[in-house]
Each structure stands twice: as structure tokens, then as C-alpha cells.
Design a protein with these regions (language model features):
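Bacterial N-terminal signal peptides that target proteins for export
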Residues: 1-7
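Bacterial N-terminal signal peptides
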Residues: 9-16
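Subset of outer-membrane beta-barrel
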Residues: 23-317
Length: 317
């Protein structure tokens, strides 16, 4: 089996476990949402209350805590033609240096599949275990009057049958207003826009290069305290992948959340994706002081996609 063939099969196996399968995007580690709360709400990342680095770094200014840390895992259903379980795992931390500044660091890993190798005659050779990881940094600055800007950068290492390294960047801005009223009830509004996964192609050698899945994302979230112990929230966001040019993709997701006593939450939503990559989403969460526990399940609506679950734990100090 030649190198190019191995790379193509490895990409297909990785993609078979992710939403990006039909679109030729073999770097789903840069685009898959690792935050369980927003995953349950149609992957509307503007509603992030954790995993700020990978969703909306500016949202850290909505909390009165100085330090935040999160860990999450997304596990996908078994991919056809591969052994093992594909998963994406993430760690992130953020720290507010002052009233207007915050910095972030994180790490992501995607892998878990094993592919059977063979030579040109079909004889078995060694197994191949593709994986990707990223080392990530971020910074956000509060401009004032609810506005903030942010930027993140990622060092990428990708192993198929050959290795490739590269970099990706994200720039965005957000607006928050926590002094709103809706029907005489206190409300909080968050708006977010960004361009992500910007960077040069990854070069695996032998003329095989992979274009990063660059996208534009816009979203918003609104929460309302309808009573002393009852809060409802809604979120909506869209993403348009315009790179690679031959694999353009539009996704739109939204969801609702009900929270009792600022402690227990239930969530549901729907994510539309071109080319039968849609999901029904659902989940629940628990919060106690600074501790956050969340879980989500994303159920595919067609064979082209993949069902998966996400669990996350976080703490704000």
C-alpha cells in the first residue's frame, strides 16, 4: 500500500467518525465543539459558559471569577472499516490578568482508530493509527461598553502514515449586555462573530497537502430570569466553511435551556448541516458554586453523519 493510499484511507476513517465526512475535512479537531453545554444546544457556541478558548474567549468577562479550567471528551460511534473508537479530548484554562485582559492555554487530541494495512498485492502489513493534536493559546481584551476582541493560535501536529505540522489562527469579537430586561425580567445577551481555522495547508509529503477547514461563525445567546429560581436561555449560531473550496459547508444550530435554582439544567436543540450532516441534540448539566458538570448527546438524522456524546467538567476559581 503506497503512502498516498494510506493517507487517503486514514483521512476517510477519521472523517467517518465526524461530521465532516462528506466534505473532505480531515482536521475536525479544529472544528468539533468540545463544550458539552453548547453541544446540547445545537452546537451554538455563543452560549459558552466554559471551554472559552475553543468557543468564545470573551465570555470569560461574564463571570466574576479570575481562573477557569475545563476538561472534556467527545466519543463518536464506531466508524466503518476501522477498529477502535474515535474521540476528541480537550483541556483548557483561562486567567483574567486584570479587568480588561485574559489569557488562555489548551490542548486537544483526536484519535483512537486503527486501520489495517496491506501491500500492493493485498497482503497484510502493519496497522496504522492516525491521530491529530493541537497546542493552543488565546488572548482577549475587553474594549468597554460590552465589546471585546480576541485571538487564538494553534500549533497542529497531524499523523496519518506520514507526519505534518502547521498552525491555525482564529480572530473574533463579542458583545455582552447583562443589564437588559425582557418583559420586566432580568436578561443577559451575548453576541459573537469569528473567523476560525485560518492557516496554510498541511504538507504530508508525496504531493499530498490538506487545506485547513476555514470558517466564518456568527451567533448569539439570550438568558432570562423568569422567576427567582427559574431561568430560561436560547442560543442560535451558524458556521460557513469556505475552505477547502471544493468542500464548502453551511451549518446552523440552535437550542433551549431551562435551569432550576442556578444548579440543574436540561437542554435540547437541533443542528442543521448541508449534505445530511444534521443532528438532534440534548443534554443536562449540574452547577454547584464553581463546579460545572455537563453532558450532551448528538443524534445524527442521516447515515452521512455520526452520532456522538460529549461529557465535560469545569471549575471556576
Amino acid at each position: 500500500m503506497n503512502t498516498k493510499h494510506i493517507i487517503l484511507i486514514a483521512c476517510a476513517a477519521l472523517l467517518g467518525a465526524t461530521q465532516a465526512n462528506a466534505q473532505g475535512q480531515d482536521l475536525s479537531i479544529l472544528t468539533t465543539n468540545t463544550d458539552a453545554r453548547t453541544a446540547a444546544m445545537g452546537n451554538a457556541s455563543a452560549a459558552a459558559e466554559g471551554m472559552y478558548l475553543y468557543n468564545n474567549p470573551a465570555a470569560i468577562f461574564s463571570t466574576d471569577k479570575k481562573f477557569t479550567a475545563d476538561a472534556a471528551a467527545s466519543l463518536f460511534e464506531k466508524a466503518e472499516g476501522a477498529d477502535g473508537t474515535f474521540g476528541i479530548y480537550a483541556l483548557s484554562a483561562g486567567y483574567k490578568l486584570a479587568k480588561r485582559h485574559a489569557v488562555f492555554a489548551g490542548f486537544r487530541y483526536a484519535g483512537g482508530l486503527s486501520l489495517k494495512g496491506s501491500d500492493l498485492l493485498g497482503n497484510p502489513t502493519k496497522d496504522y493509527k492516525p491521530y491529530n493534536w493541537t497546542l493552543d493559546l488565546g488572548y482577549t481584551y475587553f474594549l468597554g461598553k460590552g465589546f471585546a476582541a480576541y485571538a487564538t493560535g494553534s500549533l497542529i501536529y497531524s499523523h496519518l502514515s506520514k507526519n505534518a505540522t502547521g498552525a491555525a489562527f482564529c480572530v473574533g469579537g463579542a458583545y455582552q449586555n447583562n443589564e437588559l430586561t425582557l418583559a420586566n425580567k432580568p436578561a443577559n445577551l451575548m453576541l459573537d462573530a469569528k473567523v476560525g481555522a485560518i492557516g496554510p495547508q498541511l504538507d504530508y509529503g508525496n504531493k499530498h497537502k490538506t487545506t485547513l477547514p476555514t470558517y466564518l461563525a456568527v451567533g448569539g445567546a439570550l438568558s432570562v430570569d423568569v422567576a427567582e429560581k427559574h431561568q430560561v436561555a436560547a442560543a442560535l449560531s451558524s458556521r460557513y466553511f469556505f475552505q477547502p473550496t471544493e468542500a464548502k459547508l453551511f451549518m446552523l444550530g440552535g437550542g433551549l435551556e431551562y435551569t432550576y435554582n442556578k444548579m440543574v439544567s436540561v437542554r435540547a436543540g437541533y443542528e442543521y448541516g448541508d449534505h445530511d450532516l444534521s443532528h438532534v441534540t440534548m443534554g443536562a448539566g449540574f452547577k454547584y458554586h464553581g463546579l460545572r458538570l455537563n453532558g450532551a448527546y448528538n443524534l445524527k438524522t442521516a447515515d452521512a453523519g455520526s452520532s456522538y456524546c460529549t461529557i465535560g467538567i469545569g471549575y471556576d476559581f
